Amino acid sequence: MSSSISAPEGIINPPIDELLEATDSKYSLVIYAAKRARQINAYYSQLGEGLLEYVGPLVDTHVHEKPLSIALREINAGLLTSEAIEGPAQ
């Protein structure tokens, strides 16, 4: 049985090596993906209320796909940009 819709890629695909090219370290990747996943989750939560404060997923999604998997695919596709936050001046 063949289908034109591919299965969700999940957290193991895209590979971590490709994702690390978008950030300085694995720690910044975790923060980057977590923030975007929270935005996606908030977007889905506010849809029922008619508010559009957050931007929805920038890649095609599947019904049961988790926000973190969507965020990682967006980062891998180069659809998001991150900016370094300066620490407090001493």
From Swiss-Prot:
<dbReference type="InterPro" id="IPR036161">
    <property type="entry name" value="RPB6/omega-like_sf"/>
</dbReference>
<dbReference type="InterPro" id="IPR003716">
    <property type="entry name" value="DNA-dir_RNA_pol_omega"/>
</dbReference>
<comment type="function">
    <text>Promotes RNA polymerase assembly. Latches the N- and C-terminal regions of the beta' subunit thereby facilitating its interaction with the beta and alpha subunits.</text>
</comment>
<keyword id="KW-0804">Transcription</keyword>
<comment type="subunit">
    <text>The RNAP catalytic core consists of 2 alpha, 1 beta, 1 beta' and 1 omega subunit. When a sigma factor is associated with the core the holoenzyme is formed, which can initiate transcription.</text>
</comment>
<keyword id="KW-0240">DNA-directed RNA polymerase</keyword>
<dbReference type="GO" id="GO:0003899">
    <property type="term" value="F:DNA-directed RNA polymerase activity"/>
</dbReference>
<dbReference type="Pfam" id="PF01192">
    <property type="entry name" value="RNA_pol_Rpb6"/>
</dbReference>
<dbReference type="GO" id="GO:0001000">
    <property type="term" value="F:bacterial-type RNA polymerase core enzyme binding"/>
</dbReference>
<comment type="similarity">
    <text>Belongs to the RNA polymerase subunit omega family.</text>
</comment>
<dbReference type="GO" id="GO:0003677">
    <property type="term" value="F:DNA binding"/>
</dbReference>
<dbReference type="GO" id="GO:0000345">
    <property type="term" value="C:cytosolic DNA-directed RNA polymerase complex"/>
</dbReference>
<keyword id="KW-0808">Transferase</keyword>
<protein>
    <recommendedName>
        <fullName>DNA-directed RNA polymerase subunit omega</fullName>
        <ecNumber>2.7.7.6</ecNumber>
    </recommendedName>
</protein>
<keyword id="KW-0548">Nucleotidyltransferase</keyword>
<dbReference type="InterPro" id="IPR006110">
    <property type="entry name" value="Pol_omega/Rpo6/RPB6"/>
</dbReference>
<dbReference type="GO" id="GO:0006352">
    <property type="term" value="P:DNA-templated transcription initiation"/>
</dbReference>
